[in-house]
Amino acid sequence: MEEFQGYIEREGSWQHNFLYPLIFQEYLFRFAYGHGLNQSILLETSGNRKYSLLIVKRLITRMDQQNHLIPSANDSNQNDFWGHKHNFYSQMISEGFSGIVEIPFYRLLIASLEKQKKVKSHNFRSIHSIFPFLEDKFLPLNSVLDILLPYPAHLEILVQILRDWVRDASSLHLLRFFLYEDHNNNCNSLFTPKNSISFFFFRNQRFFVFLYNFHVCEYESIFFFLCNQSSHLRSTSYRALLERTFFYGKLDYLVNLFTKDFAVILWLFKDPSPHSVRYKGKFILASKGTFFLMHKWKFYLIHFWQCHFSVWSHPRRIYLNRLSTHCLDFIGFLSSVQLTSSVVRSQMLENAFLIDNTIKRFDPKIPISTLFGSLAKAQFCNRLGHPISKSVWIDLSDSDIIDRFGRICRNLSHYYSGSSRKKSLYRLKYILQISCARTLARKHKSAARAFLKRLGSEFLEEFFTEHEKVLSLILPKNGSNSRGFYRGSIWYLDIICIHNLANDE
């Protein structure tokens, strides 16, 4: 991307956020397809077609000579610019345009990192970093909003959102062209409420994923602005303890200051500690405020989406619950805040007494019933959780079969290592172990029990990670653990996506 940045710096069109001239540059299509200047000019796709720079040059020449890339939304079907290879050429240009439209946001990211002097790290991308945040922030909170973000109802909303970032009209017309072109070939709305991930199955995944992420980013930018206004004094007061003097008096003054212009959002200032987290299309907002206050948050968000983004959101897409009695279904975990009682016996001189303490504990659990359904769908077990053989793998070698089962088992162990209850994880491992044994037994036409007896204990070792073996030696064991492995919560910070079995939606 640094090489990409060097090309952009030499383009005068970037100075005014004019992106349309960049689409006539041949080198941008190399970067759009993930290839450097010294790599092959052919890019293999999922099908049998190949992209070549010769085709790109011809398309650029035709675009430069004709004026067919600025159509209206109504006559996009009558446009014959692409000829008989309409879908192929359209996809090529749209993927190149996807790389171009990401330029402003990449530059903003670099500028932000340089300003904040943050070091790039892959750990920043780990989705497991969310759970230590929840453990730290959610314990003193009371209520939570479980939100499914709404989708844009009309294509023009996406174009209007991008106007502040892409200033030349030609780029917006080209964006509108690709949106309507793909829309007319697929469905009547870009993001259908019936299937929250339908946009991933469009021809140009990168293009539509970018648009969806940008749409959600606009939600967050305005929403977090309001949250920061309510928590500004609280966040700056930690720099010096003296600043906490008359803290709530300052907060009341801030409320009076915004009475005239922002009367609708005055209640935001009465709760200075909301915490939020988002992954994909799901958003969680938790607060220490009352249940009535969270109801205000709920209806405010609905009106906010309707008035500012012209997006209608059904109230049932926002669930209001108490953290102490409700489990959050988030990123493959069922998370809740449990109250744990501990009784301590204390004796002072001749008097002995008991101290009963109630401690809040963040409790992430494995959704075992959901995972049973995922394993059954992948043909590792039936709907009741009984292991079955994986018939499609019978033609593989024994080592490949064991390696595939072991890899799935280790990945699940890493992903659910932060679970507070490991018994469910052991049940998943057991299903995979027996399914592997039955697959091998079916291949060799023998009984599964006899096959397991022949393999011995070394076969089971394939299903435990090296990390588990090391932890069993250096960390204390909790309770009666028959397998002898550590049962505490450990979050691996190198996980950047949900496991396929955990993400079965």
Swiss-Prot record:
Matching Pfam families: Intron_maturas2, MatK_N
Higher taxonomy: Eukaryota, Viridiplantae, Streptophyta, Embryophyta, Tracheophyta
Name of the gene: matK
Keywords tagged on the record: Chloroplast, mRNA processing, Plastid, RNA-binding, tRNA processing
Gene Ontology CC, one term: chloroplast
Source domain of life: Eukaryota
Family (UniProt): Belongs to the intron maturase 2 family. MatK subfamily.
A GO biological process held by the record: RNA splicing
Entry's localization field: Plastid, Chloroplast
Signal peptide positions on this chain: none
GO MF annotation: an example: RNA binding
Keyword Chloroplast found: yes
Protein name: Maturase K
UniProt organism field: Silene otites (Spanish catchfly)
Entry-linked InterPro entries: Domain_X (IPR024937), Maturase_MatK (IPR002866), Maturase_MatK_N (IPR024942)
Known function: Usually encoded in the trnK tRNA gene intron. Probably assists in splicing its own and other chloroplast group II introns.
